[in-house]
């Protein structure tokens, strides 16, 4: 990957959360962008990675939504005097990446017991589900940003998306009173290129070529008694004839020829 594209991809993680579409909208848009490539069995890098994240997000999203629904249904059977487990006792996403998946439940259970040894069983299940759902949501957020990057590279081209992320980051980091009211859009960035390409084919005007070209001598014309003569043409040798005078006769023609009538 190009170094500028790699830097832009890293900057995607710093963009605001509300910049990206919701999960449902994102997956639908990504599938629309990927469908032509799926039909042609394309093995482009962006196609393969975006397809992977579409499948991953759909599975994780459904699982996470199920966790939230079960956790909410357990609230009715948790004793009302039960205090919720503080956030500090719940495993965070960064910690979960260092813990083997099979040991995740054991580590979370130990933390709940350290908070309150006789914590109610329904409240424990609720705490587990909330912790796992939070971990999944953070993983989904990273996957969502990566999916956005890859399917937009298919739509607009990697170079255009890289340029767009750079401009957007600059706009976001500029104080509000020194920047434009509206954030840059990728459509506005790519539009001049599309207009230039189309205009080159349909333009009927003349366009000055770039670079050096031989200078052309202007052709001046003059009008002599209704006839146009180009001054650039090679001029004939001067003659004693003046404009409007009869043609001069040769010396041999000074004597009149004998008249046919006598």
Curated annotation (Swiss-Prot):
One GO location term (cellular component): host cell
Biased composition (Basic residues): 215-234, 252-262
UniProt keyword RNA-binding, yes or no: yes
Transmembrane residue ranges: none
Gene Ontology BP annotations: microtubule-dependent intracellular transport of viral material towards nucleus; symbiont entry into host cell; viral penetration into host nucleus
UniProt xrefs under InterPro entries: Hepatitis_core, Viral_capsid_core_dom_sf_HBV
Pfam families tied to this protein: Hepatitis_core
Motif, Bipartite nuclear localization signal: chain positions: 215-233
Residue numbers spanned by region Disordered: 183-262
Keywords annotated in UniProt: Capsid protein, Cytoplasmic inwards viral transport, DNA-binding, Host cytoplasm, Host-virus interaction, Microtubular inwards viral transport, Phosphoprotein, RNA-binding, T=4 icosahedral capsid protein, Viral penetration into host nucleus, Virion, Virus entry into host cell
Residues recorded with modification Phosphoserine: 232, 239, 245
GO molecular function, one term: DNA binding
Region annotated RNA binding, chain positions: 254-260
Ranges in a coiled coil: none
Family statement drawn from the similarity comment of this UniProt entry: Belongs to the avihepadnavirus core antigen family.
Subunit structure: Homodimerizes, then multimerizes.
Purpose of the protein: Self assembles to form an icosahedral capsid. Most capsid appear to be large particles with an icosahedral symmetry of T=4 and consist of 240 copies of capsid protein, though a fraction forms smaller T=3 particles consisting of 180 capsid proteins. Entering capsid are transported along microtubules to the nucleus. Phosphorylation of the capsid is thought to induce exposure of nuclear localization signal in the C-terminal portion of the capsid protein that allows binding to the nuclear pore complex via the importin (karyopherin-) alpha and beta.
Name listed for the protein in its UniProt record: Capsid protein
Organism: Duck hepatitis B virus (isolate white Shanghai duck S31) (DHBV)
């Amino acid at each position: 990957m190009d170094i500028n594209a790699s830097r832009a991809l890293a900057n995607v993680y710093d963009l605001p959360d509300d910049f990206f579409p919701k999960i449902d909208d994102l997956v639908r848009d990504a599938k629309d962008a990927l469908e032509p490539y799926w039909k042609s069995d394309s093995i482009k890098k962006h196609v393969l990675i975006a397809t992977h994240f579409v499948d991953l997000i759909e599975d994780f999203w459904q699982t996470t939504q199920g966790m939230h629904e079960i956790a909410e249904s357990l609230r009715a059977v948790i004793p009302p005097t039960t205090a919720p487990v503080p956030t500090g006792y719940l495993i965070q996403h960064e910690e979960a990446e260092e813990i083997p998946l099979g040991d995740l439940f054991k580590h979370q259970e130990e933390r709940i017991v350290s908070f309150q040894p006789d914590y109610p069983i329904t409240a424990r299940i609720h705490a587990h589900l909330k912790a796992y759902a939070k971990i999944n949501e953070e993983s989904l957020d990273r996957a969502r940003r990566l999916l956005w990057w890859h399917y937009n590279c298919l739509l607009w081209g990697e170079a255009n998306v890289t340029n767009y992320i750079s401009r957007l980051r600059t706009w976001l980091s500029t104080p509000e009173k020194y920047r434009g009211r509206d954030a840059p859009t990728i459509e506005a960035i790519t539009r001049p290129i599309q207009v230039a390409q189309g205009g080159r084919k349909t333009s009927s005007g003349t366009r000055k070529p770039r670079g050096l070209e031989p200078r052309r001598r202007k052709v001046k014309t003059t009008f002599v008694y209704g006839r146009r003569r180009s001054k650039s043409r090679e001029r004939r040798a001067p003659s004693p004839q003046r404009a409007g005078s009869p043609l001069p006769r040769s010396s041999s023609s000074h004597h009149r020829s004998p008249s046919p009538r006598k």
